[in-house]
From Swiss-Prot:
Part of the 50S ribosomal subunit. It comes from the Eukaryota. One of its GO terms (biological process) is translation. GO terms for cellular component: chloroplast; cytosolic large ribosomal subunit. This is Large ribosomal subunit protein uL14c. PANTHER family: 50S/60S RIBOSOMAL PROTEIN L14/L23, LARGE RIBOSOMAL SUBUNIT PROTEIN UL14M. The gene is rpl14. It holds the Pfam family Ribosomal_L14. Keywords: Chloroplast, Plastid, Ribonucleoprotein, Ribosomal protein, RNA-binding, rRNA-binding. The keyword Plastid applies. CDD domains: Ribosomal_uL14. Binds to 23S rRNA. NCBIfam families: rplN_bact (TIGR01067). InterPro entries: Ribosomal_uL14, Ribosomal_uL14_bac-type, Ribosomal_uL14_CS, Ribosomal_uL14_sf.
Length: 122
């Protein structure tokens, strides 16, 4: 469950290291975002000499949350951190690599490019 002011790790090589959620895309008064939701975030920590800079406002899709994800078959998935992948306006990832495990629910939400870059799909 990601809400505004939540810090997230970045799970790609776009140049950002930490993000802070400032808005959840969707309904005007959505309180929480879950895996697969698109958020508006500000970069709080970035690698020097990369295209993304600190205090830049970007869009990102959530790929891991500490809150459990319950599937229809009864299995529950929980990750150790909150993480997101930086995307552009069309939904394509800005980085060329994705780090860590990615849930297969992202494929159903049309983030197939992120799923194809991931080393492991759970």
């Amino acid at each position: 469950m990601i809400q505004p002011q939540t810090y997230l790790n970045v799970a790609d090589n776009s140049g950002a290291r930490k993000l802070m959620c400032i808005r959840i895309i969707g309904a005007s008064n959505r309180r929480y975002a879950h895996i697969g939701d698109v958020i508006v975030a500000v970069i709080k920590e970035a690698i020097p000499n990369t295209p993304l800079e600190r205090s830049e406002v970007i869009r990102a899709v959530i790929v891991r949350t500490c809150k459990e994800l319950k599937r229809n078959n009864g299995t529950i998935i929980r990750y150790d951190d909150n993480a997101a992948v930086v995307i552009d306006q069309e939904g394509n990832p800005k980085g060329t690599r994705v780090f860590g495990a990615i849930p297969r629910e992202l494929r159903q939400l049309n983030f197939t490019k992120i799923v194809s870059l991931a080393p492991e799909v759970l």
